[in-house]
Amino acid sequence: MTLSDAVAHLSPHRWARANRLLIRKALAEFTHERLLSPEADGEGRYTVRSDDGLTRYTFTAVIRALDHWQVDAESITRHRDGAEVPLSALDFFIELQKSLGLSDEILPVYLEEISSTLSGTCYKLTKPAVPAAELARADFQTVETSMTEGHPCFVANNGRLGFGIHEYLSYAPETANPVRLVWLAAHRSRAAFTAGAGVEYESFLREELGGETVERFHAVLREQDLDPADYLLIPVHPWQWWNKLSVTFAAEVARRNLVCLGEGDDEYLAQQSIRTFFNRTSPTKHYVKTALSVINMGFMRGLSAAYMEATPAINDWLAQLIENDPVLRSTGLSIIRERAAVGYRHLEYEQATDRYSPYRKMLAALWRESPVPSLREGESLATMASLVHVDDQGASVAGALIRQSGLTPVEWLRRYLQAYFTPLLHSFYAYDLVYMPHGENVILVLKDGVVQRAIYKDIAEEIAVMDADAVLPPAVERVRVDVPEDTKLLSIFTDVFDCFFRFLAANLATEGILAEDDFWRTVAEVTRAYQKSMPSLADRFRQYDMFAPEFALSCLNRLQLRNNRQMVDLADPSGALQLIGTLKNPIAGF
């Protein structure tokens, strides 16, 4: 690849298109979060003015449930000094810096994230457009690598600060380029391997790597007069080796606490979360999740060595809870367990930092089960994020699945809700247990376009038990969190209603497939059906009212605009919430 080839996707027409799409999203989501207050000009047309009042953006929009602004990208125009001027996302954030609450310190870093997001969109625009109907029938990894929007709420959602253009082209999930992981030997005095029930280190590594590869790696150690029995093997993202470990952990390499063994044989595909890899060579083998010290959507994407120690136990506990609960079992819910984990402690950095520091999250990995072996005849897999994916003609994958299924839109939706939403309700009301159930964290099992069951993932880092009195095994105690009573239900209202159903309902309504009222009526009916089936939890249903008239608006972009390097204090995540006013509960009237 030549120097100019690396930026061939950055053409004027693609850049203009990417800017228009991003400004559309910014107008919609920042208005939703009440950072912007568009002036109505009549007939669905609105104006937003810059901080100095000299620039104005005009556009048409439909306002839907949950104060969702569906902005028409083609309608957006920008005017200054009486003349129309080209759209520029970077200018947009500078012109509205004060309105958006961007400090002088954060602004340039945020602009860098916006530039990276725009560049990523330009790359995606070079790929042939895949119709939603085709994606609805595509294989698991084709769907995964075809996602174009990223998180539906966050505007700067593809920052990946730390990736150069060559690394973007090598490792970004949308490029779908196969990756071989780097393997290190880590001295047992600094490293720890933990695993779930029935998993033993030596046999597990041989199953994942193959006996020949393990022997090859051991030979590298023996050639340096090192004993393989003194070391644990750790998979590493290639970027992390080249950019961090080879420099930041130089002392560990020099002391032979870390030894680079080379690349593994299997080829992997990066998933939407960037640092997790699917085994393309052997799809039934485990995913590998690695530490990656790039900034993306408000966090450095490292992995804590300390957190890894309890990860398998937490997954085993949740899997057992699901297995023992007849309601969860009846929905078909499962998790793909994080079966094993390994972490490396750099003693000097630990002395110099607190437990939340990125320096403690540079070298760790976990192995997560593949969902492929669980498939039955005729079933396929798709990231739930695909439901809100819209192709270049405005057609959604959810709409395509409904057409493929032959079911009425309401019946299709009901089956999806019973598979995905009912388990969330029951986990909350029966166990005070919550997940992070956004589109990228859920895999749907489909058959003939119909959702059969849901698979939740990213368990140990994301689940929480909000009951101070719940009896938990010592190894699982970490998931207990203290959350104010009045914000507990935001785990449903924000994470599910506002951050996912809001977009799904709007897309189906826009396509003329399912009216918004019918969408939310169905959500209400599924909720009431669950509650009716569980009379023993009636007091809980009253205490935490799913049919309350309104709920607090929790703003995600405000977190990132305030601090895009670490948008949540990990010591007090609920305390970081940006609650701005309320939203009308769309199921309250049903």
How would you name each of these model-derived features?
Residues H426-Y431:
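Protein kinase catalytic-loop region centered on the HRD/HxD motif
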Residues D432-V445:
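A short glycine-rich, hydrophobically flanked beta-strand micro-motif that places a catalytic Asp/Glu
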Residues F421-L425:
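Short C-lobe core helix of eukaryotic-like protein kinase catalytic domains
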Residues M1-A419, L446-F590:
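Nucleotide/phosphate-binding site architecture used for ATP/NTP-dependent chemistry
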